[in-house]
Amino acid sequence: MGNIEAFKALFLGFIEGLTEFLPISSTGHLILFGHLIDFHSDSGRAFEVVIQLGAILAVCWLYRKKIIDLVQGFFSGDQEARHFTFSVLMAFFPAVIIGVLAVDFIKSVLFSPLVVAIALIIGGLIIFWVESRDFKPSTTEATKITFKQAIAVGFIQCLAMIPGTSRSGATIIGGMLSGLSRKAATEFSFFLAMPTMLGAATYDLLRNADVLTSDNMLNIGLGFITAFISALFVVKALVRFVEKHTLRVFAWYRIVLGIIIMFVML
């Protein structure tokens, strides 16, 4: 395994952690940068899954106190903790069902620069539309989300299976459309990411376990570490950002990047 491939793994791990929780599509960026730097890994899909796991574990670490409080509250009979836990599970199940049914089609047909470019542009336009509304949220705390809102976010999250859409972008915008404040939607998106991404990672690792060997573990480990570290900074920064700013800057980024991809890579 060459030093160049190891450096590329570090770089892609950084990109994963940087983009996973921003509404700009981490999968889309991994596809694009993987093409640009000509990254080759024998572990293939397993590499992507493990670096995504690094990013989600960063969220688990940052929200560890809230997670512990929720678990303790759930088993001690705290109604708010139980309500929020069931809300997350309700939002999680649509992705499970649709993901299992459509995963092979999505990966074989939709993983291309053209799909990423189109999804980036459409997603950017949707963000502009949502942010242009007279936005008066009915729910300002993530733990107060209603079951109806949670289910709506869950179904909208399924759109993120299309590369370039962005799981965080879909869930944040879905939350805002259903009445959550920008911050509440962002924090609910983080909590929903935990079962969604951990479940997807487990499923994909089981399917790709045969390609995990001692020869490619260095690349995987390097990508995991950089994804974890960069995600730590991004999650904290995003929560502070959405408290005072709209998501329009991400909409501009998506549209410009999508146009560049169409002209340069296609």
Curated annotation (Swiss-Prot):
Record keywords, A-Z: Antibiotic resistance, Cell inner membrane, Cell membrane, Cell shape, Cell wall biogenesis/degradation, Hydrolase, Membrane, Peptidoglycan synthesis, Transmembrane, Transmembrane helix
GO biological process: cell wall organization; peptidoglycan biosynthetic process; regulation of cell shape; response to antibiotic
Reactions catalysed: di-trans,octa-cis-undecaprenyl diphosphate + H2O = di-trans,octa-cis-undecaprenyl phosphate + phosphate + H(+)
Membrane-spanning residues: 4-24, 43-63, 86-106, 109-129, 145-165, 186-206, 219-239, 246-266
The keyword Membrane appears for this protein: yes
GO molecular function: undecaprenyl-diphosphatase activity
Membrane topology, from the record: Multi-pass membrane protein
EC number(s) recorded for this UniProt protein: 3.6.1.27
Gene Ontology cellular-component annotations: plasma membrane
Highest taxon of the lineage: Bacteria
Localization (cell): Cell inner membrane
One Pfam family from the record: BacA
Keyword DNA-binding: no
PANTHER family found in the cross-reference section: UNDECAPRENYL-DIPHOSPHATASE
HAMAP family assigned: Undec_diphosphatase (MF_01006)
Role this protein plays: Catalyzes the dephosphorylation of undecaprenyl diphosphate (UPP). Confers resistance to bacitracin.
Further information: Bacitracin is thought to be involved in the inhibition of peptidoglycan synthesis by sequestering undecaprenyl diphosphate, thereby reducing the pool of lipid carrier available.
Stated family: Belongs to the UppP family.
UniProt-recorded name of the protein: Undecaprenyl-diphosphatase 3
